[in-house]
Amino acid sequence: MPILLFLIDTSASMNQRTDLGTSYLDIAKGAVELFLKLRARDPASRGDRYMLVTYDEPPYCIKAGWKENHATFMNELKNLQASGLTTLGQALRSSFDLLNLNRLISGIDNYGQGRNPFFLEPSILITITDGNKLTSTASVQEELHLPLNSPLPGSELTKEPFRWDQRLFALVLRLPGVASTEPEQLGSVPSDESAITQMCEVTGGRSYCVRTQRMLNQCLESLVQKVQSGVVINFEKTGPDPLPVGEDTLMELCRPSNLFAAQPWHSCHKLIYVRPNSKTGVPVGHWPIPESFWPEQNLPSLPPRTSHPVVRFSCVDCEPMVIDKLPFDKYELEPSPLTQYILERKSPHTCWQVFVTSSSKYNELGYPFGYLKASTTLTCVNLFVMPYNYPVLLPLLDDLFKVHKLKPNLKWRQAFDSYLKTLPPYYLITKLESDQILASVGKKPPQEIGIKVKNHSACGLPLAHNKSFRKLLKEIIGESAPRLTELNPKEFAGFQVGLLNKDLKPQTYRNAYDIPRRGLLDQLTRMRSNLLQTRKFIVGQDEDSLHSVPVAQMGNYQEYLKMLASPLRELDPDQPKRLHTFGNPFKQDKKGMMIDEADEFVVGPQNKVKRPGEPNSPMSSKRRRSMSLLLRRAQTAPTVTNHVGGKGPLSASWFPSCPSLVKHTFGHPDTTVIHDTHEEKMENGQSPPDGFLLKSAPAEFMNVSGESFISSQLDSLSDDFTGLRKDGFIHKPGNNILLGGAKTCSLSVADQKITMASALETVPNSMQITPAMAQGINADIKHQLMKEVRKFGRKYERIFILLEEVQGPLETKKQFVEFTIKEAARFKRRVLIQYLEKVLEKIDSHHLLNNVNHINSRSSC
C-alpha cells in the first residue's frame, strides 16, 4: 500500500502571483488535485494512503496523517494559507518522523537480522515549494539542515532520518509573473539548483524546475510513473574492470585506457523493483541482504546502519548457480548506467557476484549472497538474492539430494559444519525453514503427537452398573458422589418444550407512552443503539444519508472504494478480455479502424445475435454512409425469363459445380461435406475459388487454378450426358453420386422438364424437397450466414458452403449473395466483399448464358 505524502510550502513567499493571476499556493493545490486524478487511473491506487504536511511548526504542520481519511485530506488542502516561514529542514524531519511512526512496532526494518527487501512500506514524498531562501525565526540559512534529534524510539539505529523505501521528489515553482515572449522549450524537465536537489538525490528521487504550466503537467505525469514498489540500493564496483566481450577483444586490450577515470556505472544509486505477488498482492521473499557487521552476543548495542545498503559487485564473469527446490529472490534493477553497461555486453549467460563489506567474520569483503545477471532477452538486469555464500552451499545441497539421498555421511556433515561457521547467525532461522521445506518434499507431514489424557468418565459403563455403584457409594459414605450427575435422556420421558406465548405482541412502541415503566431503561438503550447505527448485521438497503451527500463530498471515492471487496482474479489470465460494448453490440476497438480487416482486432466472442428492429431490407442501408465503397453493387446483366428456374421444379444447381450441389441438395446417404478444402490457401492470403465448390466435387469439373468451368468449356462435357435417358439420372457404378443439374441447360425445354420430373420420381418421397421445406432451409442458412460473417478471422469456406446449400431458383441464390455482401459491409470485411462480388458476376454471366442457350435451342427446333 503506497504512502503519498505531500509537503506543501506555506511560507509567505507562496503568495506571489504568476502571469495568469494565480498564486503559487493555488498552483500547488491544483497540482495535488491533478496528481490524484492521474493516479486514480491505475487500479492499484485503491490502496493508496494520502498525507498532508506543511511548513508550520510541529505538531501543527501535520494536517492529514495516519488517522485522517481522504475527505479530511481534501478539506485541509483547500484551507491552506501561506503565512509562515520557509522551514524546509524541520518540515522534512516532521514528514520522515510521521512515516517512521510505526516502523519499529511493525518490524519492517528488522534491525540486526538482515535487510529484507520484501518487508517494505513504499513512500513517496512530494514537496511543492518556490525554491527561495530557507528562513527561520533566527536568520536566513544558505544550506539545508535536518534536525538530528527525533522523539521516535529506535531512530538511533539508522544514521539518516529516511529509510530505503522512502524517496523525495521536489516540484520547484519558477513560474514568471509576466508572460514570456520566448518560445517554450520542449523536452525533459531539468533539475533545480536549489538546496533541496541534493536531498532528493540522496533519497533516490529528483527535483523538477517548473517554469510553465505545461512543464508542471509533464512533471505530474512523470511522478505518477514513479509510484513503484521498491527499495534504493547503492551499487559500487570492486576489483578490476571486466574484459570486453566480442570479436574486438584484442583491439580493446591494445587500446590505452585511463585506469584512474571513474566511469558512471562504477557507482549507481538506484531502485530495485519489488513486485507484489499476483495472488496475495503482498511481496514474497526468502533471503535477506546481509548486514554490514557481524552480530555477536557481547555487543552492548546494535551499530547504526545506513539507510541504503552498499552492495559491491565484482566484474569477474561467473556461471549462475541454481538448483531445484531451493528458493531464490529475483529483483529487477531500475534503468541506470550500470544496467546499460551490462546489457551492452550481451552476455545473458554469465553473472557478476555481489557482496556486502564486513558481513563475514573472517573475510573483509564478505562472501557472495547473490549475483547480477542480464535477462535472456537482454531487456533488463536482475538482482538474484541467494543464501549467504551460495557457491559453497549449493553443491552441498546438490550432493545431499542426488548422491546421499537425504542421508549424509560424516564427510558431508563436516563440510556443512564448516559452512555454518561462515554464516551470519540471523540466516539460521531462514535457512532452517528452507531446509525443512526441502526435506518435506515427497513425504507425508508428521502427525502431531498430543498429550493423551485417560478418560475417567463412567459413560462407557452400563446404566445398571452405574446406578448400583452410586447406591453402594451412598450407603458407605452417606452421601452421593462429589461430581456432576450424568443425565440419561431416557429418564425424562415427560419432558416438554415450552410453547410460544401467542398473546405476546411485537414491541414496536411507536408511542413512547406505551412503554411500561419497568422497560424504560432497556428500551432507551435500544433506541440509542438504533439512533447511533452501531449495528453490525447486513443492511438490506442503502441508508438515506448515502443519497443526500453534499456536492462538496460527491467526489470522495476513496472511502467508498475502501469498503468494497477486492475484485477476484481472472479464471483464465491468458484469455483476452472481452470488449465493453455498452449500448452497441457491434462496437469495436478504435485501433481496428485503421486497417482493412477491422474484425481481426476485435476482442471477445463475436457470435452475437442481430439486434431486433433492424430489418434486412434495402431500406435499412439508408442509415449507412452512401459514399462508402463497400456498398457498391455489382453490375447486373439484363435478365430474361428463365423457364427452367421459374415456376417449374426447384433447380438443383445454379453454378457449373452442379454435381456436388445436386448431391448435397437431395441428401444422398453417401454425401459428405468437408470444410477444410481451401483452409491453407485462405490463411496464406490467396483468393478462394471463385465458384462455390465443395471438396466432394469431382476433379474433372475443376481446372488447375481451382475455378469452375465457364460456358466455353461446357461442350467438352457432352460425353457425360450420352447415357442420360428420359426415365431418370445416370447412376455410375461404384459411385453413388447423382449427375445432371446445370448440364441439362444445353438440352431442350421438353427434355429438361422430363429430366427433372424423372429425377423427382427416382428419388423417394421422403427425400423430395417441398417449397415449404426449401423456405425453412433458406431461413436457417440466412441465420447461419449472419453468424459466419461476424466471426473472427479470414476463413470463409463455411460461407461459400452455406451459399451452395441455398434452395430455389438462380434469382434466390443471387439475393442471398447480395444479402451476404450487405452483412459483410456492416463489419467492413473488404476481402470477403471482393470474393462475393466475383461470385455475383459469375452468377449473372451464367444466368445470361443459360438464357442464350435456351433461345438457341428453341430456334433450332
UniProtKB/Swiss-Prot annotation:
The keyword DNA repair does not apply. Transmembrane segments: none annotated. Keywords: Phosphoprotein. Residues 3-227 form the VWFA domain. Gene3D superfamilies: von Willebrand factor, type A domain. InterPro entries: INT_SG_DDX_CT_C (IPR029307), Integrator_subunit6 (IPR051113), VWF_A (IPR002035), vWFA_dom_sf (IPR036465). Pfam families: Beta-barrel_INTS6, INT_SG_DDX_CT_C, VWA_2. PROSITE patterns: VWFA (PS50234). The modification Phosphoserine is found at S617. The keyword Phosphoprotein applies. This is Integrator complex subunit 6-like. The gene is Ints6l.
